Amino acid sequence: MRLSLPRLKMPRLPGFSILVWISTALKGWVMGSREKDTDSLIMYDRTLLWLTFGLAAIGFIMVTSASMPIGQRLTNDPFFFAKRDGVYLILAFILAIITLRLPMEFWQRYSATMLLGSIILLMIVLVVGSSVKGASRWIDLGLLRIQPAELTKLSLFCYIANYLVRKGDEVRNNLRGFLKPMGVILVLAVLLLAQPDLGTVVVLFVTTLAMLFLAGAKLWQFIAIIGMGISAVVLLILAEPYRIRRVTAFWNPWEDPFGSGYQLTQSLMAFGRGELWGQGLGNSVQKLEYLPEAHTDFIFAIIGEELGYVGVVLALLMVFFVAFRAMSIGRKALEIDHRFSGFLACSIGIWFSFQALVNVGAAAGMLPTKGLTLPLISYGGSSLLIMSTAIMMLLRIDYETRLEKAQAFVRGSR
């Protein structure tokens, strides 16, 4: 006998209907555990889990390949960065198990504490942070370096999700409700720009705006804030000579291929060498220290060179499906009025996809370089740990949503 779960009433949120439409349109492509709304036998999203493992595996393989030349030069060990990345993966796995055991109510309760802790760490890094290429973004703990900016992303999105639960009506009906999150962004932006780290500021700003849109904020508020945001970004670019060089290099990197346009031209050469099937794993020429940051910010170019167009498309599809699953999980959580979980899941999907878009766009010459990692693929301990934690939060949200539906069915069948 086929059992069915009762349909639960959707919250009426402006912007939520768009999320439902996108999710429904793509639902046949990626269905997670292939369950329908009438079945809740499998209590976790298998597709999301395997996509996460796949991206982490691709990341480890490509970090190993791309980092061998620089590892040999810096430490006389070609596998130095691969070993560290392996340690980060083990730590991420341990952290993932812990995250899966924590109910979402825990993150909601301590969201403000997490944000306060992130602000304190951002202050500490300005005082005792280790500097790399003129940017003080890391706190050196010996075996591990912490990048507070990565923790700030997750803690802010938890805080904003909780804020939207508490002040949703104020956000929709009052300008003050809309501006309060912008005030938090402003405080974080000041601390981040002091490092400097414009890329993280852009991610925080865009993701927060998207969350407010889903919560039903008025359109004219977005137009005003976006206009102010664009003006602020332009002023910040003009204030720093290195940012001006990045933008001009993005417009025409071949004008100065050995100066400001060097990194981008080398990245484009990597894509050109890759063609359809690539040069083969380990056969990149650009990673031989022609392309700076080949194992971090520009690892996507090495994927293009070694695995070709096919590898690039595969990686992008996997990233897209992870982002879609996040939005779908968020939609289902909002359907049963798990608002904190729903908003947080949507924010993770937007964050994941936007950061990947900026990284890929910078490597392909479509966007100025921002120093953002490719989620789960680029080398970077803090990024890997925080991103994997965010993915495990999605799995926990999905589990709680399915559990709620199953319990609703049991109650309804009595």
Curated annotation (Swiss-Prot):
Pfam family, one: FTSW_RODA_SPOVE
EC number: 2.4.99.28
Main location: membrane
PROSITE patterns reported for this sequence: FTSW_RODA_SPOVE (PS00428)
One of the GO biological process terms: regulation of cell shape
PANTHER family according to UniProt: CELL CYCLE PROTEIN, PEPTIDOGLYCAN GLYCOSYLTRANSFERASE FTSW-RELATED
Name this protein carries in UniProt: Probable peptidoglycan glycosyltransferase FtsW
Organism this protein belongs to: Escherichia coli (strain K12)
Lineage: Bacteria, Pseudomonadati, Pseudomonadota, Gammaproteobacteria, Enterobacterales
